[in-house]
From Swiss-Prot:
Taxonomic source organism: Shewanella halifaxensis (strain HAW-EB4)
InterPro entries: Class_I_gatase-like, HST_MetA, MetA_family
GO BP annotation list: L-methionine biosynthetic process from homoserine via O-succinyl-L-homoserine and cystathionine
Site description Important for acyl-CoA specificity, residues in chain: G111
Active site: C142 (acyl-thioester intermediate), H235 (proton acceptor), E237
UniProt protein name: Homoserine O-succinyltransferase
Principal location listed in the UniProt entry: cytoplasm
Name of encoding gene: metAS
Length: 312
């Protein structure tokens, strides 16, 4: 939330250059405040677990957030009851005519399937296209980030020979972006995927900015230069046990997965996992919600022309 300061205070210019959110007394006196409306398209198999993870992050800010849950179709989910889906999820036709401050599209266990072969690929494309006119800022996670980069910019991923699973060190590659406020020079983030994007092509694209990357895991946070789309290649929302649960699930299915890197104590899957990314995940979502949703979105959501992108 902003710090209200006197008009013309000398510190204002310094604070603003550091991406500290300050507001003059004059602006504060005329400020309209309302809850942020965020839509979540949940593509993960365990809907309730993913809902909990994302709501935990959204709830860790001082902003009031009104959340709608969206499903891709009305078919039964393998890991979630149809009653839960019918009671708490909306179909796209129910939100098509609405506008939202933010949209989160989750990952999906589709890493080895070509995009065009995904059963609901046309629905995904339709929702991505819709979001560009009806949502102030979109946060794409993991598979959704790859899918959106492919659909919006024609940048395809490359399949990996083995699943990239683990917790990896990342570094900032850009400065002076509000999204990176409070980030350490190096931080941890979890990954769980079968593909990766070509970081050189991402850096060369005139409409994209790579903000953070990992020597092992590649590009991590990529931002559209209009600040409307944020692509995160990992899973900052994961709880402590998620990589462990995925590892043992794959073992039970006879897939012979590799042990997630830098995750279990002493890299021993019989020992407890160590969560090193929770503070980063919380900061990432908080900064996105504050700087790229709350500060950019119009007060009247019926008029999306009121969006004012950050200058960078």
């Amino acid at each position: 939330m902003p710090v209200k300061i006197p008009d013309d205070l000398p510190a204002a210019e310094i604070l603003e250059s550091e991406n500290i959110f300050v507001m003059s007394e004059t602006r504060a006196a005329n400020q309209d405040i309302r809850p942020m409306k965020v839509l979540i398209l949940n593509l993960m198999p365990n809907k309730i677990e993913t809902e909990t993870q994302l709501l935990r992050l959204l709830g860790n800010t001082p902003l009031q957030v009104d959340v709608d849950l969206l499903r891709i179709h009305d078919k039964a989910s393998k890991h979630t009851s149809i009653d839960h889906m019918n009671n708490f999820y909306r179909d796209f036709e129910q939100v098509r005519q609405k506008n939202y401050d933010g949209l989160i599209i989750t990952g999906a266990p589709l890493g080895q399937i070509e995009f065009e072969e995904v059963l609901y690929w046309d629905h995904i494309r339709e929702i991505i296209d819709w979001s560009q006119q009806h949502v102030t800022s979109v946060l794409f996670l993991c598979w959704a980030a790859h899918a959106a980069l492919y659909h919006l910019f024609g940048l395809n991923r490359s399949l990996l020979t083995t699943k990239r699973s683990g917790v990896f060190t990342h570094k900032r590659t850009s400065e002076h972006y509000p999204l990176l406020r409070g980030f350490d020079d190096e931080f941890f983030a979890p990954h769980s995927r079968f593909a990766e994007m070509d970081i050189d092509k991402l850096k060369a694209h005139p409409e994209l900015q790579v903000l953070t990357e990992s020597e092992t895991a590649g590009a991590y946070m990529v931002l559209c230069k209009n600040n409307r789309n944020l692509f995160v290649m990992g899973h900052p929302e994961y709880q402590k046990s998620t990589l462990k649960d995925e590892y043992y699930r794959d073992l039970e299915q006879g897939l012979a997965p590799e042990v997630p890197q830098n995750y279990f104590t002493n890299n021993d899957p019989l020992q407890a996992p160590i969560a090193r990314w929770h503070s980063h995940g919380s900061l990432l979502v908080s900064n996105w919600l504050n700087y790229y949703v709350y500060q950019l979105t119009p007060y009247n959501l019926d008029d999306m022309t009121g969006i004012t992108p950050w200058g960078t």
